[in-house]
Each structure stands twice: as C-alpha cells, then as structure tokens.
C-alpha cells in the first residue's frame, strides 16, 4: 500500500504534508456492506471441466485516488487538521486529556475531548468536528477516527512535534531537536530568472572592417520571470488512511430538447 502525498497550507509560509494510504481491504468490505450482500461476488466464470462456477470475491485490483479525490479529501479535513494543530496539541489538552488515555484504549472525541477544547468560550457551540474517537497507540502516537463524507483514520505520529509546531505558530520561536525551524526542509515554489540578450563580440582582422557591415542577427531570448517564495515543509507528522471514499457523481449532460415552433 504505497502512499500518495498531498499538502495542506496551515499558515502563510508553512505547509503540512499528508501521506495518504488507501486501505483496500476495508474499502472492499465497506462496498459489500453498502450493497447489502455479505457474500457479494465480484467475478464469476464457468469451469469447463466439470461445469462448476468459480466465484472470486477479492480480486487483485488496485485502488487509487485521483488528484481531484485528494483535493476533495484535503478540503474536507482541513478544518479538522487546524483543530488538531492549534487546539488538540495545546499543553492543557495533552496533560489533562490525551495523556490520561492508556495505550491501546480509546475515548469518545465528541463527548470527552471536544467540549474541553473550548471550555468557557462563547464559540464552543459553533465549532463542529467530524472526529469520532481518539485511540492512543504509543507514548506520543494517536489515531483519530474521522467519519463524514470520507471515512478516515488520521494517525498523529508525534503529538510532541505538533505541540512544538503549535508553539512556533503562536509565538514564532520554535526549535526542533536543537535546530532552527528555518534550517529544516523547505518546499520550493518558484524562482525568478532573467536573461538579457547578449551581442556576440566580433574580432576584426587585417582591416576587413567593410565585410562586417552586414547586419548580424541577434539571438534574442525571451525574458522569463518567476517568483521565489520559500515555504517550510513540516515533514511526516500526520498520515491518513482512507477507509471509505464517497461515490463520484458523474456529470451527465442533458440532451437538448427540440424547441417548440
């Protein structure tokens, strides 16, 4: 299950890369449940030797996400990613909620976590999240189960790194492992290059100046302008496992009806 990479912009000069995995087995099981057939057969073929029928239930089919699928996925979970970075990784929530979860255990996000993120605030009722549960996998690793149009498992590989990231976003003074964040990996968006046409230098020998009166065709090169804007790449902090993808709605063009005379 090779991942595909998508990036989500979480600040003016910062992008969060997401490694997106497709859980093929889970998607096939979900399709069987939605079709109301527990033993749904995908392919049937007769066997010529004894006229029996071969049924294949799990063919070796590659399931992948298109660029439009990844864009729709990132657009849907962007608000929840910002909620994870800015609120869930706060020191108060880590110490009072996340650290209380034992390794291998889960808790309801909507009941036990979301109300504490905005406790005492006037906008707590206006905040919506589609994260259903939080499971602690290791000391700093957590799994968030997300279900809306997409059904996902969002893996936080290190809540400690996200807490440091939140500190940088809030106060612009973050260091990672003793190095400045500006020394970390960056994403190159574009750069600016300008080339001016150059006139070749001609050497005159033995008084042949009259032979050089003919016009010289200059190799004029176009001026190409680019803009360079450095963006900080945060590395592999969050992984997304796709469990269910919404159906693609095909746009069908309606046939033109004949105009009434």
From Swiss-Prot:
Null mutant phenotype: Accumulates recombination intermediates blocked at the RAD1/RAD10-dependent 3' flap cleavage step. Abolishes association of RAD1 at single-strand annealing (SSA) intermediates. Insensitive to MMS, HU, or phleomycin treatment. Doesn't sensitize cells to UV lesions. Substantially increases the rDNA recombination rate.
Keyword entries, A-Z: DNA damage, DNA repair, Nucleus
Gene Ontology biological process terms, A to Z: double-strand break repair via single-strand annealing, removal of nonhomologous ends
Location relative to the cell: Nucleus
GO MF annotations in UniProt: 3'-flap-structured DNA binding; 5'-flap-structured DNA binding; bubble DNA binding; Y-form DNA binding
One Pfam family this sequence matches: Saw1
Disulfide bonds: none
Example of a GO cellular component annotation carried by this entry: endonuclease complex
Function: Catalyzes 3'-non-homologous tail removal of RAD1/RAD10-dependent single-strand annealing recombination intermediates. Plays a key role in targeting RAD1/RAD10 complex to 3'-flap cleavage substrate in recombination. Also contributes to the integrity of ribosomal DNA arrays.
Miscellaneous information on this protein: Present with 1170 molecules/cell in log phase SD medium.
Subunit structure: Interacts with MSH2, MSH3, RAD1, RAD10, RAD51 and RAD52.
Protein name: Single-strand annealing weakened protein 1
